[in-house]
């Protein structure tokens, strides 16, 4: 082991270390082998079925009318993940031929007349026939389990055949797990960039996420132990088109014994308002044993995303490790500001910030239009007086202008308090509830008479809405000369279950929502100016290929980890946090900026006046300069495991004011690691008022290091140094 002792991280200082190592890599390719070791213990029409996938052991109880998961365990160290009887699935069906429609649950653990478990070459096939409910006789389910011995993983598929003339399949709950505490248990779930919470098996814990969206950005979760024998279970819904689904994780009590963590994925069925609709899982569900933490779980998901996800950029779009269709100016931005108002109000302030920061700046411009915010959408034009001239002036000074528009909403009273074009033009393309009424949302904006503004959610599959958004975007890029357009809510708000049969999609679930936006954005990208960019709000993953940037302003929670950047770093630019006020605003400013840096995000999205304050400007200039020297790692590289630091490192706590008071506690010493080819950059940022000391532990093999010579470069507070030859021994020596 080598100990690199970092002597001091001074007050508000940021020290950065770049290691360059020459390593030989031997690429081995091997065919994936699917295999399962199985055992059956039968008696009285019942059997106990065991499926062994490498070191992951599963046991099922099969009865004439049910199948139950009895246990799931790490066979190597005898760590139990599931010890309480758990259903494989639950179906929710609705009787459609009665006025008082009620949803009926049917699970794998009861309610079937015929159940079978057939052993296959690589696992099992479970079949469920003839539900005991007399009117459900034409519903059957097939669940296929495949064991991958080499990966210690179980792969699941489910198909529901519904030949009922009166029942519609509404939702499929699959997978379904009741996880026992693995010992010092930790849960990773996909809110924002990914969030890790401890002690979730005790107390009152509940996470509910609607995918895809900013608060449920990915299709996987993980639970693992943080003790000396790390063992974890990765649960991934590997759906390559990102169909709408809900992830629910909650702490529940099963009887009088220890509490369990109930994890379910609930998927709305396509054509959920029509009797006789079927369901087939597009892709597969994966349970995989891993030994590590959130970073290892993220890498499992990344491996699948790069290989199969329809939204991941490939080919000419992502060549030589670089997102080629994103303009160079967008890739190379290091800092953003945002503000609101007329050209006279915003131009002097933004230009002054550009002068102070001495770097190119991205500018997110709100309220450039004459209509009020969140009102009279989508009638943004005419813009405020001299808007185009202001755009030209700012961009002449290396300020890249990105105006706000909404990509999802049409005001139901779209000319003051009058219904101007909504009913006559837009209503046919609005999303509809099953009763035929449009889905309508309100966000706090008011009409002149004090009533809430009611905004209809538009259906992205309709040509009317696709063409309207395209018209607005091209007006801004071509007529007004902006370098980017921000299209709000696309990667933030989850799909609504539109039931309008005149639209070109099945009612309810499926991936049609994503595919509608893909077509819209593809059409825009095909005709937009080559050097322009498209961005949107938050980081719901299925739109990455069609966007150049995600506004990650909502990454504001305790316990958040950079799982999303570990998966998508370089595939899209992530920028922006909400920077706000309060008595701890300066500390919160440093915490957010430092976290953005180590996460690989472009910095800022603050008001120019806040960032220009003397107590913030010095720190910001250092961190922007440092990012400019290492941005190639974020654009073309890949996140590596954050370095392991030891010592008496203090914590800091500040009110981030995300929603009222919003206290966030972090380490005072932020750190991260990124790799590009044979080089690794280790990043450290001290945000506290005191000098902080820490010890960095490096094991043989970390960051590709072997016992050899290496080049060391240190960038401190944005100041580069010459490379120095060093030797890194990995026995009992220490390098200081």
Regions found by a protein language model. Give the residues of each.
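Active-site neighborhood of glycoside hydrolase catalytic domains
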Residues: 457-547, 559
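Acidic (Asp/Glu-rich), glycine- and aromatic
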Residues: 150-206, 689-695, 700-701
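Active-site-proximal substrate-binding groove within the catalytic cores of carbohydrate-active enzymes
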Residues: 72, 278-284, 513-709, 716
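The substrate-binding groove and active-site-proximal loops of carbohydrate-active enzymes
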Residues: 329-344, 369-385, 449-470, 481, ...
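C-terminal beta-strand-rich structural cap/linker in extracellular carbohydrate-active enzymes
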Residues: 713-736
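Acidic-aromatic substrate-binding/catalytic surfaces of carbohydrate-active enzymes
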Residues: 46-134, 185, 296-302
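Active-site-adjacent "subsite" loops/lids of carbohydrate-active enzymes
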Residues: 386, 400-475, 479, 557, ...
């Amino acid at each position: 082991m080598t100990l690199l002792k970092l002597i001091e991280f001074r007050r508000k200082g940021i020290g950065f270390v770049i290691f360059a190592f020459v390593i030989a890599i031997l690429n081995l390719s091997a065919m994936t082998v699917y295999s399962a070791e199985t055992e059956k213990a039968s008696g009285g029409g019942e059997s106990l079925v065991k499926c062994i996938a490498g070191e992951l052991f599963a046991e099922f109880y099969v009865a004439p009318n049910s199948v139950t998961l009895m246990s799931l365990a790490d066979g190597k160290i005898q760590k139990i993940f599931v010890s309480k009887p758990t259903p494989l699935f639950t179906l929710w069906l609705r009787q459609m031929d009665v006025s008082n429609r009620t949803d009926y649950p049917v699970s794998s653990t009861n309610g079937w007349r015929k159940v079978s478990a057939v052993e296959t070459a690589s696992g099992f096939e479970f079949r469920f026939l003839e539900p005991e409910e007399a009117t459900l006789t034409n519903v059957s389910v097939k669940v296929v389990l495949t064991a991958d011995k080499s990966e210690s993983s179980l792969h699941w598929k489910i198909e529901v055949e519904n030949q009922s003339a009166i029942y519609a399949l509404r939702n499929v709950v699959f997978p379904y797990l009741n996880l026992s505490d693995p010992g010092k248990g930790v849960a990773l779930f996909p809110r924002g960039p990914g969030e890790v919470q401890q002690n979730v098996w005790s107390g009152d814990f509940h996470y509910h996420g609607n995918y895809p969206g900013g608060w449920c950005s990915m299709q996987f979760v993980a639970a693992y132990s943080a003790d000396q024998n790390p063992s974890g279970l990765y649960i991934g819904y590997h759906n390559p088109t990102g169909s709408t689904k809900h992830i629910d994780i909650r702490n529940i009590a099963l009887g009088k014994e220890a509490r369990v963590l109930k994890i379910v994925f609930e998927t709305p069925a396509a054509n959920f308002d029509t009797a006789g609709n079927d369901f087939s899982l597009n892709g597969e569900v994966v349970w995989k044993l891993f030994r590590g933490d959130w970073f290892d779980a993220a890498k499992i998901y990344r491996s699948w995303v790069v290989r199969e996800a329809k939204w991941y950029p490939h080919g000419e779009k992502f060549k030589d490790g670089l997102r080629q269709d994103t303009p160079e100016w967008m890739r190379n931005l290091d800092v953003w500001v945002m503000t609101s108002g007329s050209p006279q109000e915003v131009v002097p302030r933004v230009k002054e910030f550009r002068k102070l920061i001495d770097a190119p700046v991205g500018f997110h411009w709100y309220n450039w239009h004459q209509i009020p915010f969140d009102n009279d959408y989508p009638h943004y034009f005419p813009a405020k007086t001299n808007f185009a001239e202001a755009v030209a002036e700012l961009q002449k000074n290396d300020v890249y202008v990105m105006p706000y528009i909404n990509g999802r909403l049409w005001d139901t009273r779209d000319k003051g308090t009058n219904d101007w074009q909504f009913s006559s033009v837009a209503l046919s393309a609005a999303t509809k509830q099953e009763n035929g009424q449009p889905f309508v949302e309100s966000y706090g904006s008011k009409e002149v008479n004090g009533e809430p503004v009611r905004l209809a959610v538009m259906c992205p599959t309709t040509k009317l809405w696709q063409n309207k958004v395209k018209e607005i975007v091209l007006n801004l890029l071509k007529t007004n000369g902006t370098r980017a357009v921000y299209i709000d809510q696309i990667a933030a708000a989850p799909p609504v279950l539109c039931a309008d049969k005149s639209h070109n999609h099945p009612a309810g679930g499926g991936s049609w929502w994503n595919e509608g936006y893909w077509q819209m954005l593809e059409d825009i990208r095909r005709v937009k100016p080559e050097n322009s960019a498209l961005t949107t709000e938050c980081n719901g993953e299925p739109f990455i290929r069609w966007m150049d940037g995600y506004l990650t302003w909502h990454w504001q929670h305790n316990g958040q980890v950079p799982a999303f950047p570990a998966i998508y770093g370089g595939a899209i630019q992530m920028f922006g946090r909400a920077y706000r006020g309060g008595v701890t605003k300066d500390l919160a400013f440093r915490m957010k900026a430092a976290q953005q840096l180590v996460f690989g995000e472009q910095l800022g999205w603050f008001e120019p006046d806040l960032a220009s304050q003397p107590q913030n400007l010095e720190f910001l200039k250092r961190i922007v300069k440092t990012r400019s020297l290492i941005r190639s790692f974020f654009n073309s590289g890949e996140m590596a495991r954050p370095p392991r630091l030891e010592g008496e490192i203090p914590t800091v706590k500040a009110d981030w004011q995300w929603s009222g008071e919003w206290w966030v506690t972090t380490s005072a010493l932020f750190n991260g690691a990124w790799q590009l080819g044979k080089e690794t950059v280790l990043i450290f940022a001290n945000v506290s008022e005191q000098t902080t000391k820490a010890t960095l532990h490096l094991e043989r093999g970390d960051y590709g290091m072997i016992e050899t010579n290496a080049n060391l470069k240190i960038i401190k507070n944005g100041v580069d140094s010459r490379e120095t030859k060093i030797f890194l021994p990995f026995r009992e020596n220490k390098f200081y």
